[in-house]
C-alpha cells in the first residue's frame, strides 16, 4: 500500500491521541476494553474533526491550481462546512457554503448557533437552502460554484463529507496507519474499530487502511443516515476507488463493508432515547462529549453491542470520535435538564 505518493498539506497537530474509556468499560461490565481515537482533538482549526483530516489531501490541488474560493455543502449544522470555512481562512481563500435543511428539527436558534455560527464568524458566505437530506451531488452546490465563476472567481469544489472527491478516502487510510503505529506503542492490536457512517468516505478510507493488515471486516460502521442502502453503496464505491489509488493489492468487495443499521433512527439528525442516553452516559463517566447527529449514534451502537455481548470477552474496541460536538448548542432544548 502506497499513500506517500499523494501530496498532503498538514492541517492537524499530528497523530490524534488514543485514550482509554476506563470508567465506561467498567460500567458496562469490564469484559470489553473500550478506547477512543480523538479526531475531535486533531487540529487547532475551529475544533477540527474528521473532515480536517480529509482536507489535508484535497487542498494541495486547490493551492497548486490557483483556486481562490472553497465551495462546500452540508446541513445547517454541518461539521464539514465549519471545517472547510476554517481551512479557507487558514489558507487565505474565500469560502462559499451551501447549508441545506437536512434535519427535520425546529428550534429558533438552530441556524444561528454551533457550526453555522462559527462559519459566519470565520467569514464564510453562508447560503441557506430549503432542500432536504440526501446523499450525492446537489443542485444547490453546483449553482453556488456557477455563481463564483460568474463573479470572476475560481471555485474549488468540496462535496459533502469530501466523499465524492476522488481523494476523499485518503485521510482515513492514513488514520489506519496512525493506529498501527500507536498499537506498537500500546503493545496490543484493536480487535474492532467502531465508526459513524453517512456519506461514506471516512468509513471507506478506514476500511481500506485496515484491509492492509486483514482487519477490513473489523471496521464496524454505524449508520446515521437512515438511508443505509445509499450509505452502503457509497462506502463500497469509495473504498474500491481508494484501494486502487493506494495500490492496496486486493479487491474490496461488498462483504468487506460492515454497516450496522440499528441506530440511525428516527431519521438523519434526530436522536432517539438510546442516542441521548449514550451521550449522557459517556459525558458523565468520561467527560467526553458526543453529538445527537453522528457520534451519539455511533456511541449508542458501541454501548449497545457491549451490553448485548456482541464483542467477545476480552476484546479491545477502538471508538473513532470524529468530532461533531459544536452542533450540541443547536440541540440545547433536548438537554435543558442535563
Swiss-Prot record:
Entry's transmembrane regions: none
Active-site positions on this chain: 78
Keywords tagged on the record: Hydrolase, Pyridoxal phosphate
Reaction(s) this enzyme catalyzes, per UniProt: 1-aminocyclopropane-1-carboxylate + H2O = 2-oxobutanoate + NH4(+)
Pfam families membership: PALP
Signal peptide annotation: none
Role played: Catalyzes a cyclopropane ring-opening reaction, the irreversible conversion of 1-aminocyclopropane-1-carboxylate (ACC) to ammonia and alpha-ketobutyrate. Allows growth on ACC as a nitrogen source.
Family assignment from sequence similarity: Belongs to the ACC deaminase/D-cysteine desulfhydrase family.
Protein name: 1-aminocyclopropane-1-carboxylate deaminase
Originating species: Pseudomonas syringae pv. tomato (strain ATCC BAA-871 / DC3000)
Amino acid at each position: 500500500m502506497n499513500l506517500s505518493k499523494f501530496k498532503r498539506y498538514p492541517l492537524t497537530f499530528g497523530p490524534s491521541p488514543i485514550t482509554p474509556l476506563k470508567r465506561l468499560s467498567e460500567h458496562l461490565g469490564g469484559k470489553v476494553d473500550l478506547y477512543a481515537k480523538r479526531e475531535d482533538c486533531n487540529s487547532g482549526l475551529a475544533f477540527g474533526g474528521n473532515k480536517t483530516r480529509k482536507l489535508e489531501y484535497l487542498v494541495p490541488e486547490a493551492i497548486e491550481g490557483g483556486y481562490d474560493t472553497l465551495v462546500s455543502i452540508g446541513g445547517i449544522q454541518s461539521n464539514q462546512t465549519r471545517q472547510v470555512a476554517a481551512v479557507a481562512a487558514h489558507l487565505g481563500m474565500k469560502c462559499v457554503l451551501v447549508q441545506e435543511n437536512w434535519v427535520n428539527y425546529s428550534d429558533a436558534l438552530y441556524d444561528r448557533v454551533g457550526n453555522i455560527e462559527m462559519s459566519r464568524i470565520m467569514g464564510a458566505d453562508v447560503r441557506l437552502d430549503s432542500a432536504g437530506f440526501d446523499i450525492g451531488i446537489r443542485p444547490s452546490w453546483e449553482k453556488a460554484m456557477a455563481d463564483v465563476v460568474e463573479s470572476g472567481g475560481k471555485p474549488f469544489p468540496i462535496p459533502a463529507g469530501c466523499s465524492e472527491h476522488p481523494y476523499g478516502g485518503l485521510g482515513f487510510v492514513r488514520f489506519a496507519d496512525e493506529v498501527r503505529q500507536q498499537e506498537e506503542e500500546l503493545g496490543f492490536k484493536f480487535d474492532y474499530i467502531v465508526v459513524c457512517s453517512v456519506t461514506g468516505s471516512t468509513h471507506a478510507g478506514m476500511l481500506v487502511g485496515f484491509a492492509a493488515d486483514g482487519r477490513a471486516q473489523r471496521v464496524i460502521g454505524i449508520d446515521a443516515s437512515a438511508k443505509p442502502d445509499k450509505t452502503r453503496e457509497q462506502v463500497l464505491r469509495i473504498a474500491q476507488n481508494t484501494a486502487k489509488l493506494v495500490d492496496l493489492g486486493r479487491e474490496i468487495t461488498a462483504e468487506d463493508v460492515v454497516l450496522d443499521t440499528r441506530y440511525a433512527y428516527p431519521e438523519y439528525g434526530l436522536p432517539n432515547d438510546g442516542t441521548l442516553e449514550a451521550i449522557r452516559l459517556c459525558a458523565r463517566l468520561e467527560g467526553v462529549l458526543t453529538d445527537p447527529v453522528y457520534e451519539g449514534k455511533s456511541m449508542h451502537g458501541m454501548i449497545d453491542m457491549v451490553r448485548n455481548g456482541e464483542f467477545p470477552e476480552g476484546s479491545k474496541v477502538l471508538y473513532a470520535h470524529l468530532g461533531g460536538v459544536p452542533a450540541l448548542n443547536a440541540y440545547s432544548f433536548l438537554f435543558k435538564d442535563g
